[in-house]
Amino acid sequence: NSSGMCCGTAQNSYNTLASIRVLLADGCVLDTGDAASVTAFRSSHASLLDGLAGLAASVRSDAALAARIRAKYKIKNTTGYSLNALIDFDDPVDILAHLMIGSEGTLGFISQVTYKTVPEYAHKASALVFFHDMETACRAVVGLKSRPVDAVELLDRASLHAVADMAGMPPLLKTLADGVTALLIETRAPSAFELDARVASVLEELQPYPLVETATFTTQALEIERLWQVRKGTFPAVGAVRKPGTTVIIEDVAVAVPMLAACCLDLQKLFAKHGYHEAIIFGHALEGNVHFVFTQDFGIEAEVARYAVFMDEVCGMLVEKYDGSLKAEHGTGRNMAPFVELEWGSDAYQLMW
């Protein structure tokens, strides 16, 4: 259910799914875009569908649990299974189809997906805007969310430093002061006239903030691509300088946008506390979704122990302080599987079994 730079929670796979073809563990193939396949499945798997319908009914009858599920999906969330399917759909075939999203193959093998399309506007403008500190940059994101923006990507000072020596990077990256945080902002429109209006709206939002340099948007395709290479180069940059024998770890968390600044600052404090000095933070600020990347040696027992304590503290902080998502868009995976119940609570967690 990864939605990347622009799709957020409104245009992700869950909300744009038109049909899905899936192979279940018993060998049955269900194609929700084929009426004959659906009819046959309703007959052959009536007990499975009845079970899903019953599970959905039990969730809806529990007001507190249903409210918890709704609240969890107001931000990006792929921790565990897509429990929102149990309250969003009445037809158990639709419930089954949407449970597949983010399930990482544990419920079935997805062989085909048909999506509803969304507009892809030809007119685009991008700007890389530098703020003096993380808190100010994140505060700006709160305001930008109400403006006509399609993407707002956050890059902390460490991530900007990581790509500074790559070919084609803006020279300014090499001279930025400690703490400087960038927002890569993009707006799109159906016409050049409308694009100008949207750029003006974004600049109006940025006007009160003291910036490292004046915010300037470009509409030139090559220049836009150059700016986006700053963002796209962050993850490979960490891998390129890792020590032999270490593994690059990338995590994927989300909090409500007003909490983003405090969350990022807390993450940076934990990096320092546990000695992950090369760690970087970047991500989809418009949705409160950030990735943090660092390297880890799993061949040394003491290093594994350090990592375990670090992850315990990260997960505890994200859940207990921010009620965040431990996996925002990339599925649960091995790293976060032990923490699913911590995030969801026992009642919701039991639904997944």
Where do the PLM segments sit?
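C-terminal substrate-recognition/cap domain of FAD-linked oxidoreductases
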Residues: 85-93, 97-309, 317-325, 333-335
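Short, hinge-like loop/turn segments at secondary-structure boundaries
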Residues: 3, 170-171, 345
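Loop-rich catalytic cores of soluble enzymes, especially ATP-dependent carboxylate-amine ligases
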Residues: 57, 65-66, 333, 339-340, ...
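Short acidic-hydrophobic sequence patches enriched in Asp/Glu that either
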Residues: 12-14, 198, 306-310, 344-351
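Activity-critical C-terminal alpha-helical subdomain
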Residues: 237, 241, 338-353
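Residues on a specific face of well-ordered alpha-helices
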Residues: 18, 81, 312, 316, ...
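FAD-binding subdomain of flavoenzyme oxidoreductases
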Residues: 1-141, 146
